[in-house]
Amino acid sequence: MKLQVPRSSLKRSIFHKKRKELLSSLPKIEAKAVARYIRISPRKARAIANTIRGKSVEEAFQILAFSPKKAARIMEKVLKSAVANAENNFGLSVENLYVSECYVNDGPRMKRIWPRGRGRADIIQKRMSHITIVVRDRSKEDEYRKALEELEKKISSEE
């Protein structure tokens, strides 16, 4: 069921404020960690990100521990941070966590000059990455889905 957003700007702003307040009352089931401006090529980091996406946290740690790639060491730190955020900030248990999202975005590029023959020069681009990992609690997903459905019914009935 798609919620109907009011057309007038005043009603729309009130609608979104109410919706935001009500959404904040939902149970927290995910935690996030971001590493920004990491000096590794996004293409190389994405290969590792694709291997751990959808896996349980324990399985993801094992995959990262046995990978010889530089990106695996970085992802391991970010994953540890996401798990710590889930435990400390939201009280989620580690056994039920899984990697729901894991993606790598391009960061800025440092440009360096590489001298070539006959007075020419090539530009070397040293790439950076922004790595984001979101962990989610499997045991609380049904509870969250039910609460969200009730909330949407409540919002649609108020209009």
Swiss-Prot record:
GO molecular function: rRNA binding; structural constituent of ribosome
Top-level taxon in the UniProt lineage: Bacteria
InterPro entries membership: Ribosomal_uL22, Ribosomal_uL22_bac/chlpt-type, Ribosomal_uL22_bac/org-type, Ribosomal_uL22_CS, Ribosomal_uL22_sf
Pfam family, one: Ribosomal_L22
Gene3D superfamilies, A to Z: Ribosomal protein L22/L17
Protein's UniProt keywords contain RNA-binding: yes
GO biological process, one term: translation
The keyword ATP-binding is assigned to this record: no
Alphabetized PROSITE patterns for the sequence: RIBOSOMAL_L22
Keywords: Ribonucleoprotein, Ribosomal protein, RNA-binding, rRNA-binding
Physiological role: This protein binds specifically to 23S rRNA; its binding is stimulated by other ribosomal proteins, e.g. L4, L17, and L20. It is important during the early stages of 50S assembly. It makes multiple contacts with different domains of the 23S rRNA in the assembled 50S subunit and ribosome.
Subunit structure: Part of the 50S ribosomal subunit.
Family stated for the protein in its record: Belongs to the universal ribosomal protein uL22 family.
Name recorded for this polypeptide: Large ribosomal subunit protein uL22
UniProt gene name: rplV
